[in-house]
From Swiss-Prot:
It comes from Cupriavidus pinatubonensis (strain JMP 134 / LMG 1197). Pfam families: AceK_kinase, AceK_regulatory. It catalyses: L-seryl-[isocitrate dehydrogenase] + ATP = O-phospho-L-seryl-[isocitrate dehydrogenase] + ADP + H(+). This is Isocitrate dehydrogenase kinase/phosphatase. GO terms for biological process: glucose metabolic process; glyoxylate cycle; tricarboxylic acid cycle. ATP binds at A328, P329, G330, I331, K332, G333, L334, K349. The active site is at D384. Belongs to the AceK family. The keyword tRNA-binding does not apply. GO terms for cellular component: cytoplasm.
Length: 608
């Protein structure tokens, strides 16, 4: 039953609500400005600035939340505002959002500010937005009809497709000229015809394209859909810089699984200029219907909204399930305590209070490693994480062995409280949540020969792509990598991660005498950040089946020269080309267009 006041009588309540919305509006204005600048940097080929903008943007949200919280504390003594006034603040805020174009994001911002100011006993729908209050359906950009969420094009026939795609590209008004747009458009049309074969053109045949480009790494993506009769097909066209410095259309992606990988949790967030983000999410859900809205918001750079929606989905799942949280199967980690809910496809990771030898680390250092991954280009090889504080779980849903494990390994991270319904709850003070994957060591142990070979190929590619992106995993054991549902190998254990350019690539010195040669111990000096690729054989090639596949595909991983060549290119300022789609789909490989850009791996990337 609602306990909201019947009258909105407080001027302070309105002023606080207005201040909070002003804070959000400032945040989103800056967010959009970065997205607009991404187009300028892409046109100029200024990849280092693009990377820096991507990193900086991640901090925008928390900066505005802190800034707004300080204003409320200083000007309104927010922590001492009475409960009834806080309820009026929420109602005033809802009123201010009536015609807002980003109401769902503004509600999440309200929650973020409140959770900084209020005790967690206030984290219910009377005071914050546990459920959304404003609908995002059918929000239209009436102020700028020339910039709709998406544009519709009508080819009319197969013959009209070339002109249609040329108009699509021109409408993005890219300043950098194309190398040969007519040639590239011809490749797009040919790719469409080869994919669909002899399909009948329906009267409603049309192409819808989102009005903003999607920028990530060194690529700008055109994202759309093809509608014909009662079928809808995804469409993605990557635009890249050619060797001449001019632009080219690199491929046309028409398979649902190919578009899914573009929005995978293993990739960095896109930079997209969106007036109405909910409309973009609705469009993207149409071409990726099984993709959770939380993941789509996150991939668009709106990770706080994604985090909010994920938590709502999680609470909904808890309400409609009855299985218990258990300790995650597999080899126990030295730093993290990992648990899972079997019916839910995620794992929960809590930093332990104590770390046995040989681990030398701290809680703050581990958290900084996870933040590094959040800000860095994940190139499809590192899992994104959701970070939460003070999460309350029903104690009755926790397996007794798991509770004992938490009390033993992470006592400072848990506490108990009485829930609103009177039931006992266990509160986890800090937790990371990641998509659950099959640990690579288990995949290699239990897989067929074909699966094992695929796993080793993917593992080697993952290592090479990570170091090309300036990431050294630290602990390269197979147990620290997972296999996604589509068979891609992804790194997910970050407590020893570091920038590859901070590492010293070394060869193992020649032994100076027989005693050193026969020694079972390391007899040479090892300094911090030293890596010896030749020694990786010891812990990677123990299984004869693995050894055979590994040496067939990735023997160069044991060659210090390969590692040093990557480091030298990074130090020279080179930004590698990473393709979030199989390189076999590139027009240079399909139709023989002049080549440009060398992928890190020497064969087609698989979809994750």
């Amino acid at each position: 039953m609602s306990h909201f006041p019947k009258l909105l009588s407080s001027q302070i309540a309105f002023d606080v609500a207005r201040t909070m919305l002003d804070g959000f509006d400032k945040h989103y204005r800056l967010f959009r400005e970065v997205s607009r600048q991404a187009k300028v940097k892409f046109e100029a080929g200024d990849w280092h600035s693009l990377q820096q903008m991507q990193r900086d943007r991640i901090a925008f949200y928390n900066e505005r939340v802190r800034e707004t919280s300080v204003i409320l504390e200083d000007e309104y003594d927010a922590e001492n505002i009475e409960d009834e006034i806080w309820q009026q603040i929420k109602l005033h805020y809802i009123g201010l959002l009536t015609n807002h174009h980003q109401p769902e994001l503004a509600e999440t911002f309200f929650n973020s500010v409140c959770t900084r100011l209020l005790h967690r006993s206030y984290f219910n729908n009377d005071f914050i937005f546990v459920r959304p209050a404003i609908s995002t359906e059918y929000i239209e950009n009436e102020e700028s009809p020339t910039r709709p969420t998406f544009r519709a094009y009508y080819p009319g026939s197969r013959q009209g497709m070339a002109e249609c795609f040329e108009r699509i590209v021109h409408n993005f008004q890219l300043e950098t000229p194309f190398e040969d747009l007519r040639r590239d458009v011809g490749h797009v049309v040919r790719g469409v015809e080869e994919h669909f074969g002899d399909f009948r053109i329906a009267p409603n045949f049309q192409i819808h394209v989102l009005s903003s480009l999607f920028f990530r790494n060194k690529t700008a993506f055109i994202i759309g859909r093809i509608v014909n009769a009662d079928r809808t097909y995804p469409l993605a066209i990557p635009i890249v810089h050619g060797p001449s410095g001019k632009l080219t259309l690199d491929a046309v992606l028409l398979k649902k699984v190919q578009v899914l990988i573009l929005f995978s949790f293993t990739h960095s967030y896109f930079m997209v200029d969106m007036e109405i983000p909910s409309a973009y999410v609705t469009f993207l859900r149409d071409i990726m219907p099984r993709k959770p809205r939380a993941e789509i918001y996150t991939s668009l750079g709106l990770q706080k909204q994604g985090k909010n929606l994920f938590y709502r989905d999680f609470l909904h799942h808890l309400q409609h399930s009855s299985d218990k949280f258990i300790s995650a199967p597999g080899i126990k980690g030295l730093v993290m305590l990992v648990f899972t809910l079997p019916s839910y496809p995620y794992v929960f990771k809590v930093i332990k209070d104590f770390y046995p030898a040989p681990k030398e680390t701290t809680r703050e250092l581990i958290k900084s490693k996870y933040q590094l991954v959040k800000q860095h280009d994940r190139v499809g090889r590192m899992a994104d994480t959701l970070e939460y504080s003070n999460v309350a779980f029903p104690l009755s849903r926790f397996d007794e062995d798991l509770v004992r494990e938490l009390e033993h390994h992470a006592p400072s991270m848990i506490e108990y409280q009485r829930g609103k319904d009177g039931g006992e709850e266990i509160v986890v003070r800090h937790v990371y949540i990641e998509r659950r994957m099959t640990p690579l060591n288990i995949w290699l142990q239990e897989g067929t020969d074909e699966q094992l070979e695929h796993g080793i190929i993917e593992y080697g590619n993952a290592i090479k792509e990570l170091i090309a992106a300036n990431i050294f995993p630290g602990d390269m054991l197979y147990k620290n990598f997972g296999v996604t549902r589509h068979g891609r190998v992804v790194f997910y254990d970050y407590d020893e991660i570091e920038y590859f350019t901070d590492c010293n690539v070394r060869r193992v010195p020649q032994p100076r005498n027989e005693e050193e040669e026969m020694s079972g111990d390391i007899w040479y000096t090892v300094r911090p950040h030293d890596i010896f690729p030749e020694t990786f054989r010891t812990f990677l090639l123990g299984n004869p089946r693995v050894r055979e596949a590994f040496l067939r595909h990735h023997e160069d991983l044991f060659d210090p020269a390969m590692w040093q060549s990557h480091k030298d290119r990074l130090l020279a300022g080179h930004v590698h080309d990473f393709f979030a789609y199989p390189i076999s789909e590139r027009f240079i490989n399909r139709y023989g267009t002049a080549a440009h850009g060398t992928p890190v791996a020497s064969f087609a990337r698989r979809v994750a």
